[in-house]
Amino acid sequence: MAAAFLNLGGYVFVFFSSFLAIVAPQVRGNVAVFDSYWTQRQSDALKQTIGSYDPHPLNVTNHFNYHVNIAVDASESRNDTRRELTQVRSGRKTHKSSGKCLAYNPIDNCWRCDRNWANNRKKLADCVLGFGRRTTGGKDGPIYVVKDASDNDLINPKPGTLRHAVTRDGPLWIIFARSMIIKLQQELMITSDKTIDGRGARVYIMEGAGLTLQFVNNVIIHNIYVKHIVPGNGGLIRDSEAHIGLRTKSDGDGISLFGATNIWIDHVSMTRCADGMIDAIDGSTAVTISNSHFTDHQEVMLFGARDEHVIDKKMQITVAFNHFGKRLEQRMPRCRYGTIHVVNNDYTHWEMYAIGGNMNPTIISQGNRFIAPPNEEAKQITKREYTPYGEWKSWNWQSEGDYFLNGAYFVQSGKANAWSSKPKTPLPNKFTIRPKPGTMVRKLTMDAGVLGCKLGEAC
């Protein structure tokens, strides 16, 4: 996860790796020294966590499912010819051959069929649903164009590089002048109110360190590849426009959320990270992970890292419209505490289990498709870890509208709808809590992962 840092105060210090090895196990949250800058950021982040928590999660899941129903019903009425239905059945990403844009899920339906998307990029910020629905990223700031794929200066990053962009003060909407491969020398410290928007280019973050969102608020990560991420050795790294810090070795997570709030990760393709693909810990909440594609990894998502971190009871995350693909082993996600809405995802492969956790997380699984592996010992979707039945039988793990294939099965516990107070503003009865069923998932996830957006064309 996130590594450690030390304020330089304008001076340059040299620390040996042996010093870091001694300090690292003793630090709080991997922070070697809390200077006034990071103490303030941590304090602000805790306030954001508490303020971003929704005491009525059922209202959020209702809102989400309502919009899915509206979008699917509208798309079905527009696209009911035999040719178009055949295309959807035949596989993913074949819909453009008809010359029409099909966007069944409401997030994509909000923006993706606009041929003028490149001149209206910030429309994307109006489209997020789920627990991260208030995320706007850099909507209120100017466009920043990344023109240089290098990452050679970690202390004073070169203008025009991604590292320079994400460490600026204030909101920015970050786009890319061309396709590029960015090999991060050390973890990329992203500050608040940023959008990383890879549309119109092929942007690969690969064969280097990953992305870190530590004690930040309001970030969108959209339409990029994150592949072959490795641990960083740590060292002096700029973590904001006015601050440079000393970091210990990073774990090799693809995207690491540490005390991060109002985060939206959308249309990301992720493969082979040294540790987790997406980890959200230590008070991270108000997060939506959507329309993404995951392959070739052991431990995909970790939500909550330690039993003693009870702040993660405030954790609320939506996992929606994703494709969990080939050669994945477990943790899709693995949860400690919190409320996790897992909805309309396609689980086509897992080797051990799909969804697991401990410390009484609430897991609401709705309208997913689960295809179990051939191994008879791995057909159970769920796994409660380090907890006897007498304790976990009261946890609220509910399945509704899921589609089970090849012997897959979900072991439920708790009582239906006991996990939330009644909605403050109930929606029409037709849509209350009712997801689109797992049989619809192929349509809802058919464009999961990075989109090949071209100027003047629908994505």
From Swiss-Prot:
Reactions this protein catalyses: Eliminative cleavage of (1->4)-alpha-D-galacturonan to give oligosaccharides with 4-deoxy-alpha-D-galact-4-enuronosyl groups at their non-reducing ends
Keywords: Calcium, Glycoprotein, Lyase, Metal-binding, Signal
Cofactor binding mode and count: Binds 1 Ca(2+) ion. Required for its activity.
Disulfide bonds listed in the record: none
Binding site for Ca(2+): 251, 275, 279
GO molecular function, one term: metal ion binding
Signal peptide positions on this chain: 1-29
EC number per UniProt: 4.2.2.2
Active site residues according to the UniProt entry: 331
UniProt-listed Pfam families: Pec_lyase_N, Pectate_lyase_4
GO biological process, one term: pectin catabolic process
Magnesium keyword on record: no
Keyword Metal-binding: yes
Cofactor: Ca(2+)
Glycan attachment positions: 59, 79
Pathway in which the depicted protein is active: Glycan metabolism; pectin degradation; 2-dehydro-3-deoxy-D-gluconate from pectin: step 2/5
Expression by tissue: Expressed in pollen, but not in leaves.
Enzyme class: lyase
Homology family: Belongs to the polysaccharide lyase 1 family.
Protein name: Probable pectate lyase 3
Originating species: Arabidopsis thaliana
Taxonomy of the source species: Eukaryota, Viridiplantae, Streptophyta, Embryophyta, Tracheophyta
